[in-house]
Amino acid sequence: MFAVIFETRPQPSQFDTYLTIAKSLRPELANIDGFIENIRYKSLSRPGWILSLSFWRDEKSLVRWRTTATHHMAQEKGRDGVLEDYHLRVGQVTASVRSNEVKRVETVDAREQDDVTAVGAAKTVQLVRFQMDRGAGIDAAAGKLGLNPEEPRGLLAWDIMEAVLSPGDMILLASWETGSSSVSIPGADSDEVQVLRDYGKYDRREAPQFYPPAS
């Protein structure tokens, strides 16, 4: 299974346009063979940042979507002024926790090991889903997870986000230098993602399509 971790910061004046574009993509996205789900979250620590998190059966499924005209047009609009900034990571799910049972996914072959991002400092991203009361702050959420930023153990960056359409559905986005130190709470589902590509608006060295970096 593959994950696309797409963090965006729409221009404040273009936020409604961003939502309109996102909504227009859903019908075709849902019909792509191998598409699993897409959920949007808003950051609790970085005002204006949105996470679009999608899961795909395999890399071919993701390629099917990336080569559609609809996706290409949305990219053009985003780059042409809707998005002030973005950070996109694509990776393979290497371990999952469901109902407190760990499932190690043995699908990372030698080619994929060689393809681990050379640009991004974080080679692993951990995604932990959990529930909080609606409107809970980031300190309360971090406390529930037992997350201690003072003891990073390879933790490069983290954020906690709340689902846009279902307040109270939270996700921890933790970027680790190598493998992750497990962060878990009872009843929480999590995925570990090995990052294969890492790029953004201002650094596109690992992007699959050529666009000149924004200046």
Swiss-Prot record:
It catalyses: jasmonate + NADPH + O2 + H(+) = (1R,2R)-12-hydroxyjasmonate + NADP(+) + H2O. Its main location: endoplasmic reticulum. GO terms for molecular function: oxidoreductase activity. It holds the Pfam family ABM. The keyword Endoplasmic reticulum applies. Residues 2-90 form the ABM domain. Disruption phenotype: Fails to develop blast disease on the rice host but does not affect vegetative growth, asexual development and appressorium formation. Significantly reduces the host penetration ability. Leads to the accumulation of a methylated form of jasmonate (MeJA) resulting in a strong induction of the host defense response in an otherwise susceptible rice plant. Does not affect the ability to cause blast disease in barley. Keywords: Endoplasmic reticulum, Oxidoreductase, Secreted, Virulence. GO terms for cellular component: endoplasmic reticulum; extracellular region. It comes from the Eukaryota. It is found in: Endoplasmic reticulum; Secreted. InterPro entries: ABM_dom, Dimeric_a/b-barrel, Jasmonate_Hydroxylase-like. Its EC number is 1.14.13.228. Signal peptide: none annotated. The keyword rRNA-binding does not apply. PANTHER family: ABM DOMAIN-CONTAINING PROTEIN, BLL5343 PROTEIN. Monooxygenase that converts the endogenous (and likely the host) jasmonate (JA) to its hydroxylated derivative 12-hydroxyjasmonate (12OH-JA), also known as tuberonic acid, a compound that attenuates or disables jasmonate-based host innate immunity and which is essential for proper initiation and elaboration of the blast disease in rice. This is Jasmonate monooxygenase ABM. It comes from Pyricularia oryzae (strain 70-15 / ATCC MYA-4617 / FGSC 8958) (Rice blast fungus). The lineage of its organism: Eukaryota, Fungi, Dikarya, Ascomycota, Pezizomycotina.
